[in-house]
């Protein structure tokens, strides 16, 4: 009986050594969410894009 326990313990120990330890994986980087075009009053100083009405007039409208 004792010999059986030793064999079972040795088999479990060998199996534990054979299986690689789990590696903690880092979380993937979050996908940035683009903000809409800010209101004209939030621009610093006079900007040519402050009162642009066209869709392609402002570089920020691409992300809207």
From Swiss-Prot:
Residues 1-18 form the signal peptide. Residues 19-40, 63-64 form a propeptide. GO terms for molecular function: neuropeptide hormone activity. The keyword ATP-binding does not apply. GO terms for biological process: neuropeptide signaling pathway. Coiled coil: none annotated. Keywords: Neuropeptide, Secreted, Signal. The keyword Kinase does not apply. GO terms for cellular component: extracellular region. It is found in: Secreted. Transmembrane segments: none annotated. This is Neuropeptide-like 4. It comes from Drosophila melanogaster (Fruit fly).
């Amino acid at each position: 009986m004792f010999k059986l326990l030793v064999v079972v313990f040795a088999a479990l120990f060998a199996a534990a050594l054979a299986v690689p330890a789990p590696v903690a994986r880092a979380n993937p980087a979050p996908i940035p969410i683009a903000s809409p075009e800010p209101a004209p009053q939030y621009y610093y100083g006079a900007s040519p894009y402050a009162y642009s009405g066209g869709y392609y007039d402002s570089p920020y409208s691409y992300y809207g």
